[in-house]
Amino acid sequence: MTDYTQRTRRSAAAMRGIVAAAAAVLGLASCGGGGSNPLDNPDSLQNPTLQGNQRLAFAYFQRCVFPIFNLQLPIRFANGTTAVNTCAASGCHDNANGTGGAFRVIPNAQPIDLTNPANTPDIIRASDMYKNFYSAQGEVVFGSTTLSRILAKPMLINVLHGGGLVFDSAQDPNAKVIQFWINNPAPSGTDEFSSATFTMFTPADPNTGTCRTQ
């Protein structure tokens, strides 16, 4: 075989490789690559953004959600055994001795009067109650109660929970309180202490109102 023939065959093989690569790129684009670059991730995989950096309502948390963590609740485990315990117990989510993952609760945190002007945001954010609020909010996926671990774990929704099944269904009264909290953040552009969130109570008083769930 002459040198010329060998060079010709190598050139043809290289050209076939280039054509195959181009076809592969076009194939990726036809599978939903989107955008000007066919190797980019499709638009449908982009994470949604929150509008106005919304926050959950602190007033509703401290009056309605936090007390749930201290309730003696019946629990069912996968092996069929049952028990009665609190979420804030020392073996669960207690801030000092808990073993229940990142979610932590200070059980004896005291409520704060949000109608008292002396309780400024800085003072509230330094309190134990706010630490509980901050920890609980970290277990929330905005806009999704089923993806929020603060509900998904005690309901065993596609995730393990060492504390067993706490809420049988989304209709559990305590689960409904947490759902309402997740689904009703403070209005966009306001902070977690906004008086607009007081409508989550009937009457709209964070100190005396009852906790709405719908």
Give the location of each predicted region.
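Post-cleavage N-terminal segment of exported redox proteins
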Residues: 1-64, 182-214
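Intrinsic-disorder/low-complexity regions
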Residues: 2-3, 36, 78, 127, ...
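Electron-transfer interface patches adjacent to heme c in soluble/periplasmic c-type cytochromes
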Residues: 50-54, 85-90, 94-95, 99-214
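Sequence/structural segment immediately N-terminal to covalent heme-attachment motifs in c-type
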Residues: 59-93, 177-178
